[in-house]
Curated annotation (Swiss-Prot):
This is Aquaporin PIP2-3. It comes from the Eukaryota. It comes from Arabidopsis thaliana (Mouse-ear cress). Induction: By dehydration. Not affected by water stress. Belongs to the MIP/aquaporin (TC 1.A.8) family. PIP (TC 1.A.8.11) subfamily.
Length: 285
């Protein structure tokens, strides 16, 4: 909540007060169409995200497979894959931010839930929609390119040879921390009020964070940082290796999101103590 005031540098700025935290459990939300519209938006966005990105991964493997007539440097490469993931997040967050918040990732939803930005009901429904959307998105890839999908790994996440479990888990924790920390920073209403004279396009830094994390972690885990993305690919590909390593792509992102949420709320923002107090008061009701 803010009102326009004159800043010391002559810019128009805003006098700001933190909005109240979202109720922990809001049963009334279930009666509102806006909730279901947002859930549908999350489902469709995650479906499109997985469809385009998994197609990109498989296309790169086809074009770089020398046994199938490809060339060593064929296809988009790791850089192109990173652009595909980051670019799709930029596009989809831009399209859905005004409807659902543009989460497209259970780890992002979980982090925002911990910070009291979304209710428990909304968080659970979002995560279910994201996982179902991911399954459908990868399912479309397999339906349209069945032989290539099976032969080239199905875009599934697993720990690469030469890396131990600790390295893979750390990559997922740190990568998700970067993403969720960026989400909090880009969408911080206090920042928007303070820097109201600076046009900010929140999806841009979020998409760029995804791009940068993919460059760093594709060689290690194929880059999860999104449990729905890893889950959808594992369900449709359904091989032992992705399932054996699958826990990494839930535990790592959720730990990373938790650290990012608490760092932003309790270290960077003075509102952290208020959020903790609201959690305690909600538990005593």
């Amino acid at each position: 909540m803010a009102k326009d005031v004159e800043g010391p540098d002559g810019f128009q700025t805003r006098d700001y007060e933190d909005p109240p935290p979202t109720p922990f459990f809001d049963a009334e939300e279930l009666t509102k169409w806006s909730l279901y519209r947002a859930v549908i938006a999350e489902f469709v966005a995650t479906l499109l995200f997985l469809y385009v990105t998994v197609l990109t991964v498989i296309g790169y493997k086809i074009q770089s497979d020398t046994k199938a007539g490809g060339v060593d440097c064929g296809g988009v490469g790791i850089l192109g894959i990173a652009w595909a993931f980051g670019g799709m997040i930029f596009i989809l967050v831009y399209c859905t931010a005004g409807i659902s918040g543009g989460h497209i990732n259970p780890a992002v939803t979980f982090g925002l839930f911990l910070a009291r930005k979304v209710s428990l009901i909304r968080a659970v429904l979002y995560m279910v929609a994201q996982c179902l959307g991911a399954i459908c998105g990868v399912g479309f890839v397999k339906a349209f390119q069945s032989s290539h999908y099976v032969n080239y790994g199905g875009g599934a996440n697993f720990l690469a040879d030469g890396y131990n479990t600790g390295t893979g888990l750390a990559a997922e924790i740190i990568g998700t921390f970067v993403l969720v920390y960026t989400v909090f920073s880009a969408t911080d209403p206090k920042r928007n009020a303070r820097d109201s004279h600076v046009p900010v396009l929140a999806p841009l830094p979020i998409g760029f964070a995804v791009f940068m994390v993919h460059l760093a972690t594709i060689p290690i885990t194929g880059t999860g940082i999104n449990p729905a993305r890893s889950f959808g690919a594992a369900v449709i590909f359904n091989k032992s290796k992705p399932w054996d390593d699958h826990w990494i792509f839930w535990v790592g992102p959720f730990i990373g999101a938790t650290i990012a949420a608490f760092y932003h709320q309790f270290v960077l923002r003075a509102s952290g103590s208020k959020s903790l107090g609201s959690f305690r008061s909600a538990a005593n009701v």
